[in-house]
């Protein structure tokens, strides 16, 4: 378990209730160990909240949508922090989740299996 900013706990809880469409769609596929591993949603890690986290594989999945277009530096800093903890980060576009879920799941499963 990783330490996290306690102020993020309530925000993460609220995010789970109000997730965007792509997060909800991907969560429907990831929950209940459908890919053979357990994921949690909106997981605080350090000063960040990961969209999805698999403790067993030390894997974060982030969905990047239009709101991420101008956040390259923030995402890079966040990815470096996760890497410093030994956590792998997969970034998936919002568009791919909505339009190509089967290939998204194949790609996630491939990465889960190789970690």
Model-identified regions with their sequence ranges:
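Charged, terminal alpha-helix-loop-beta segments
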Residues: 42
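Solvent-exposed, charged helical/coil patches
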Residues: 1-37, 84, 115
């Amino acid at each position: 378990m990783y330490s996290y900013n306690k102020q993020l706990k309530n925000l993460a809880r609220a995010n789970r209730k109000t997730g965007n469409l792509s997060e909800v769609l991907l969560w429907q596929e990831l929950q209940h160990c459908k890919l053979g591993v357990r994921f949690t949603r909106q997981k605080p890690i350090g000063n960040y909240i990961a969209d999805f986290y698999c403790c067993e594989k030390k894997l974060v999945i982030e969905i990047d949508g239009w709101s991420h277009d101008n956040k390259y530096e923030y995402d890079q800093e966040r990815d470096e922090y996760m890497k410093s903890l030994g956590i792998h980060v997969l970034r998936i576009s919002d568009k791919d989740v909505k339009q190509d879920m089967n290939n998204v799941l194949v790609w996630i499963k491939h990465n889960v299996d190789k970690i």
